[in-house]
Amino acid sequence: MLMLKNGGKPVLFFEMKANAFHLWKNLNYLIPWIIDWYVNPNNQWWYNWLYKRHKLILVSSKEVYEYLLAKNTRLNIRHLALSLSDRYKITSNTCYEKKYDVILIGRQNPVLKDFLDQYKKTHPDLTIFIPSKQELASRDGYLDSMKKSRVALYATPGIDGGEKRTNGFSQVTPRFLEMVASGCNIIARYKTNADTDYYELEKFCPVSYTHLTLPTKLEV
C-alpha cells in the first residue's frame, strides 16, 4: 500500500518484501516499512544502494534489524514490530467454543505435519480441521476458523526447507499472534533468535520441537 505524498511531509508505505526493483521508490520523503527482508547476504551491498536515499527505514523483524546492525549497514533502520489491533485482545475470561481438536491453516511445516500424521494413526478420533477457501474468504472467517480449534501448529518460515525461500531468516509471522488471539494451544517449531525472543515464544510454547516424539495423549 502506497500513501500519497502530502505537502512534502514524510510518507509511510508498506513494502511486503525487500526487492531488487525498489529503485523507483528510492525517494527521500518515503519511509518504507519492510515486512519480509529475505535478502541474500551476498547481495546486501546492492540493497544498501537501493534504499540509500530514505531518511528512515523500518523493518518488522528484530532478527533482521540486529543482523543489519551487526553488518554495519549505512541505512538508518529502526525496528517496528508487527502486531494485532486491540480489537482482537483477549483476557483470562475470554472463552471460545471449540469444535475441532487441531487446525491446519496456511503453509505447513513438513516436520510438524508428519508429527501430526503419525499421531493421527494412533489416535483416530482426533479431529483435524482444514478450512475451505470459502471459510477463509474474509478476515472474520479466517479468525473464526482458528477460534473453533483447540490446537494449532505453528513454525517460523526459515527452517525445514524454508531456508531457501527466506535466505535463512526466520521471523515470527502475524499468524502466531492470530493463533494466540484465537485461544489456541500452540505446538510450535522454531529456531531461537532475536525475533522469537522479542515475541516471547517460549512463554506460549516452551519447547521448540527439534526432535519430535509422539506423546501418549495430545493435550487439547
Segments from the language model and where they lie:
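Ordered hydrophobic segments in well-structured contexts
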Residues: P10-L12, H211
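Conserved acidic donor-binding segment of nucleotide-sugar-dependent glycosyltransferases
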Residues: C205-Y209
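Active-site proximal beta-strand in glycosyltransferases
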Residues: L12-E15, L23-V39
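Conserved small/polar residues in nucleotide/adenosyl-binding loops
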Residues: T210-T216
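Nucleotide-sugar donor-binding catalytic core of glycosyltransferases
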Residues: M1-L2, N6-G7, F14-N19, W37-N48, ...
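Surface-exposed flexible segments
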Residues: L27, P32, D117, G168-Q171, ...
